[in-house]
């Protein structure tokens, strides 16, 4: 154990789980501070890791000073404004001997970038189509290298799908019928085959996949996405160009919880130029 009195900065799932683990190991977790006005973790982890142990969560707060030379003696928290800047006069000193930083995950893609895979600036992972194929033909991505997941169940599903589609690609290569690249270097659709951009708007930060090729879609296509803020009593709407084909009510949408919808291949006509997912 690095210490006995702990302050945690960051309320994603790892930070929340570490708060519980350090408490169970005998430490006193004094507070979990979060820069954003919402937690980045699953609701159940907030309840099971913080609420059940009486650990306070301070939203819209960050560490502005660390006291100590040879080791930490305390930290100063401050509330932040809508621009994430500390608000003068809101400082609070908290004695502690350990500061645990849990400030976000990004996919590790050194191998991908070295190969020339195009990355999504929002997720930090590759841009993929419905088969989880990148802009490099025959190169597929799944799991946390693609985008950070909440649940290992989703990682397992993506891994199975990527393996299935990679095997199908190899069979097409041997048959002399391999498709062209998913996207060009700029992320644009290849002219060799029909590709439909899939985009998020009005609160949807990104979608996986980012492109759909009707010729290679299964009848049911899972699309995963995250929102950029907390929404209550909102709806997830799907548009083909400007025509709405789906609307699903959600009591709560939060950045810390990955969302998903299922599109049907039979609902997508050949003349569609784009698909959009919006929060309404």
Place the predicted regions along the sequence by residue.
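Aromatic sugar-binding surface patches on proteins
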Residues: 255-262
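FAD-site-proximal beta/loop scaffold in flavoenzymes
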Residues: 97-149
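Phosphate-coordination loops involved in phosphoryl transfer and adenosine-cofactor binding
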Residues: 2-5, 60, 69, 136
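Surface beta-strand/loop "capping" patches
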Residues: 175-231
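Glycine-rich dinucleotide-binding loop and its adjacent helix/turn
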Residues: 1-15, 122-130
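Short, aromatic- and glycine-rich surface loops/edge beta-strands on solvent-exposed regions
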Residues: 223, 236-238, 263-280
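A Rossmann-like FAD-binding core segment of flavoenzymes
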Residues: 16, 21-110, 219-251
């Amino acid at each position: 154990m690095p210490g006995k009195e702990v302050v945690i900065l960051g309320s994603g799932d790892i930070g929340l789980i570490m708060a519980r683990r350090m408490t169970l190991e005998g430490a006193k977790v004094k507070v979990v501070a979060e820069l954003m006005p919402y937690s980045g973790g699953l609701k159940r982890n907030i309840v099971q890791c913080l609420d059940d142990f009486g650990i306070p969560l301070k939203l819209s707060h960050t560490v502005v000073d660390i006291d100590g030379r040879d080791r930490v003696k305390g930290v100063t928290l401050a509330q932040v404004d809508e621009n994430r800047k500390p608000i003068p006069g809101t400082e609070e000193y908290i004695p502690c001997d350990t500061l645990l930083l849990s400030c976000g995950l990004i996919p590790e893609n050194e191998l991908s970038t070295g190969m020339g895979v195009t990355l999504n600036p929002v997720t930090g992972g590759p841009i993929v189509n419905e088969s989880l194929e990148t802009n490099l033909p025959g190169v597929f991505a799944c799991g946390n290298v693609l985008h950070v997941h909440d649940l290992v169940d989703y990682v397992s599903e993506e891994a199975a799908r990527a393996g299935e589609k990679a095997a199908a690609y190899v069979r097409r290569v041997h048959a002399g019928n391999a498709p062209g690249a998913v996207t060009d270097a700029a992320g644009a659709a290849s002219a060799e085959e029909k590709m439909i951009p899939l985009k998020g708007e009005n609160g949807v930060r990104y979608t996986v996949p980012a492109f759909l090729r009707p010729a290679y879609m299964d009848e049911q296509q899972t699309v995963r996405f995250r929102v950029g803020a907390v929404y209550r009593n909102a709806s997830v709407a799907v548009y083909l160009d400007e025509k709405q084909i789906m609307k699903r009510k959600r009591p709560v949408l939060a950045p810390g919880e990955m969302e998903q919808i299922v599109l049907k291949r039979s609902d997508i006509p050949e003349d569609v130029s784009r698909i959009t997912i919006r929060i309404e």
